Amino acid sequence: MITAYLAAATAAQALLPAGKGDPTWFDNPALTQKFGPAILETLMMTGLSTIFAVIIGTLLGLVLVQTGKGGLTPNKGVYQAVSFVVNIVRSLPFIIGIIMLIPLTKLLVGKSTGSLATVVPLVILSAPFFARLVETNLLAVDPGKIEAAQMMGASNRQIRWGVLIREAMPALIQSITTLAITLIGYSAMAGAVGGGGLGQMAINYGYNRWQDDVMISTVVAIIVIVQIIQLIGDILSRLVDHRAR
């Protein structure tokens, strides 16, 4: 199955022999016809992956904080089990992980290549990374505020969402920004194995056909996307930071 997947992922590359004298820039069909869709594919992969990774990672992070030492409901067994799984998944290199998850990807979306299929491994491999960021952010919340909420009779659910998440929101937004930027890089790497988007375009045309204009354009596009994401993240983080008011 893995051999078939890699063969499919490199099929486009085999059909793109390096051609001397290819049209460049605005005369290059790769840029005029495929550049825009490739950007949209990258944004789609990153957007969907970020949303699902944030949901799953936040829940895992809350479990780690609540069951850890000094948490609302300490449970060493649960904490160690969740922490072990998180560490195992985090240790997997993305390219290896995306190949290992081929059966699950095909089961969920019906195919193992393309931008939509890439979302599955992106979410699974990045959610544990975000879970650790959430854990770090929540552990940084002043314990005095948690104790004050407990003294006022707040439930664990109210403390989780009304104290921990609320107080850590600026840091959480910065962590979401970091996650989204990381996923941009992951989605580009996925292009090497048929993942679609700017990464696959850079491989197929920029590398295999030695079209420097395509390579430069994809790199610039990724840089611009990253800068915009970082800018939005910084603005949102400042807006929700009640300490800066």
Predicted regions span which residues?
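C-terminal transmembrane helix and the adjacent membrane-cytosol boundary/short C-terminal tail
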Residues: 63-69, 216-245
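Transmembrane alpha-helices
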Residues: 156-187
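Loop-to-helix entry region at the N-terminal start of transmembrane alpha-helices
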Residues: 37-45, 90, 94-129, 214-218
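Short helix-to-coil transition segments within interhelical loops
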Residues: 138-168, 208
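Non-cytoplasmic
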Residues: 104, 175-225, 231-234
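Cytoplasmic-entry segments and transmembrane alpha-helices of multi-pass inner-membrane transporters
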Residues: 63-101, 122, 133-136
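Short, strongly hydrophobic alpha-helical membrane anchors
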Residues: 1-37
